[in-house]
């Protein structure tokens, strides 16, 4: 056999050998990230959590010369105790953690099970503020051999204050690494059919358990300062789009489902209408039956369970309302997990 023939045989054999077998596929990490949680409800853990959260320039855009004296001189000396008392009302005392951590862990575990048909996929979860941190979980994914990572900021509607800061922190963690994996980030999904359908099903299921039919359903989103929206943050428009699509899916009129914004902080004007003022106004105007859901939260937390389920309910009932119900977030429900799995599988295309 000539040298040329030998080359031909070798090339032919190589062409028939796949570049990767299933055992040799590079590992792909999937990192779910939510906002964050304190480690406890006492002063120390609350102060550490609030300091990290309120020091984020994406969250508070004021000059540090103005903001830091307020933050460290006033806010962090007064707010930790108040916030701790609020967290204590919703705390998962059995696991000694906030509901957000409980649900996010469950979402990660259920997603890993759903993706078990992809043996090279590693699923994990983290928090933007608090523990487990994005940096620590990114380290863990890299240590497990992940050469590609899909990061999923768990926010259906994009805002620089949420989605962008998750991506910031993730890439900040990678800045310290010699090896940087290939990255994909899941975009906002405010109009995704699977998401709208999941919201609609959750509303329908919850309403079927009530002894009353709400006259008005509010879709309450976490607010942001109006100035952020004026500068180009698309958050408000995406929230309104979600509500419009959900309203159409449920066959409701504009007066039957309205978008509002909650959780304002500080002296600035935030996106309006405000949820707390709206429930009070509805009650004073003779509306007796109200339900509220939080489409922008993928898991129940302080802002949904307490701020809506307790505080908004009290406002409504104290001003003449008769029945108020908070519709739970999608959490780790079958509908909620279908949304997460669908979007993750889309981003995994070509990688698994």
Curated annotation (Swiss-Prot):
Give the SUPFAM superfamilies listed for this entry: Chelatase (SSF53800)
Q: Which UniProt keywords apply?
A: Cytoplasm, Heme biosynthesis, Iron, Lyase, Metal-binding, Porphyrin biosynthesis
- CDD domains the UniProt entry points to: Ferrochelatase_C, Ferrochelatase_N
- Subcellular location, principal: cytoplasm
The record's GO molecular-function terms, alphabetically, read: ferrochelatase activity; metal ion binding
Q: Which GO terms describe its biological process?
A: heme biosynthetic process
The enzyme's E.C. designation? 4.98.1.1
Residues that coordinate or bind Fe cation: 222, 303
| Annotated GO CC locations | cytoplasm
Tell me where it resides: Cytoplasm
Taken from the record, one Pfam family name reads: Ferrochelatase
PROSITE patterns according to UniProt: FERROCHELATASE
- Top-level taxon of the source organism: Bacteria
Q: In which pathway does it act?
A: Porphyrin-containing compound metabolism; protoheme biosynthesis; protoheme from protoporphyrin-IX: step 1/1
Q: What class of enzyme is it?
A: lyase
Instruction: Spell out the reaction equation it catalyses.
Output: heme b + 2 H(+) = protoporphyrin IX + Fe(2+)
Q: Which family does it belong to?
A: Belongs to the ferrochelatase family.
Functionally, this protein is described as follows: Catalyzes the ferrous insertion into protoporphyrin IX.
**Protein name in the entry:** Ferrochelatase
Question: Whose protein is this, by species?
Answer: Brucella abortus (strain 2308)
Designated gene of the protein: hemH
